[in-house]
Design a protein with these regions (language model features):
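Transmembrane alpha-helices and adjacent helix-loop boundaries
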Residues: 1-240
Length: 240
């Protein structure tokens, strides 16, 4: 979720940028990752290691081609990572869910930024604040009132979507572990009930956190100004 929120804010700012290149890159990113189902994206991440048969290494690019060209055995790398293990494990899971969530969070953050009156940013710039400082200190704090509620919903949905990690050979995932226990003990239904209760517990904690965050960032909005009793009309006094 951290990857999704930080990436979403970044792409939201890029989408609102007057630079057509940044805006186009952000639009393409949100268009692609919002359109591809998460299960398909995770399954693709699990097989992404096929594209890197020689692994991911730090050294001379395409070193194996150079070695074949000169007929030399060995590599010109300082370190090598197994791409299959990398993309089919925790890294692939975080990358797949994070990129997908960033696309949705980009639209949520963009809507929150647009909800802030433009006069706020203009006033900050008139005081000499830079664009980045205006965004961090003026616009985003006010936009949080709009951003927090859908972000809480996305966090809850993200927790539930971790069950889709069964598309990856990630044996540490909750649903996979409980399904394996049910298959070994031939008690599938109790395992599914246990998984449901665990997900319900985690999402309930997130709902409580969402409630307090909404109350914190919603302070001062939608409240009527208190009446000053000093200027209240005396009984029996009518208007002119």
């Amino acid at each position: 979720m951290i990857v999704g929120v930080s990436g979403g804010v970044l792409f939201a700012v890029m989408r609102l940028s007057p630079n057509p290149v940044l805006s186009g890159v952000a639009w393409t990113f949100t268009w692609f990752f919002r359109g591809v189902p998460r299960y398909v994206l995770l399954a693709t991440m699990g097989t992404l290691g096929i594209l890197f048969r020689q692994g991911l290494g730090l050294g001379v690019p395409f070193d194996w081609k150079l070695m074949e060209l000169f007929g030399i055995n060995g590599t010109m790398r300082f370190a090598t990572l197994d791409a299959n293990s990398l993309f089919s494990g925790l890294f692939g899971a975080v990358l797949g869910l994070g990129l997908s969530e960033a696309a949705y969070m980009a639209e949520i953050a963009r809507a929150g930024i647009l909800s802030v009156d433009k006069g706020q940013a203009e006033a900050a710039q008139a005081l000499g604040m830079s664009g980045g400082k205006t965004m961090l200190r003026i616009v985003l704090p006010q936009a949080m009132r709009v951003i927090v509620p859908p972000t809480g919903n996305e966090a809850i949905a993200m927790v539930k979507d971790t069950s889709l990690l069964i598309a990856l050979p990630l044996i540490d995932e909750l649903f996979f572990q409980l399904s394996s226990i049910g298959s070994r003990t031939y008690k599938v239904f109790p395992s599914f009930v246990a998984a449901s209760l665990w997900y319900l517990l985690v999402t309930s904690v997130l709902m409580v956190g969402q409630f307090y965050l909404e109350r914190h960032f919603g302070r001062g909005f939608g409240q009527k100004a208190p009446k000053d009793k000093r200027f209240a009309r005396a009984p029996g006094m009518g208007g002119a």
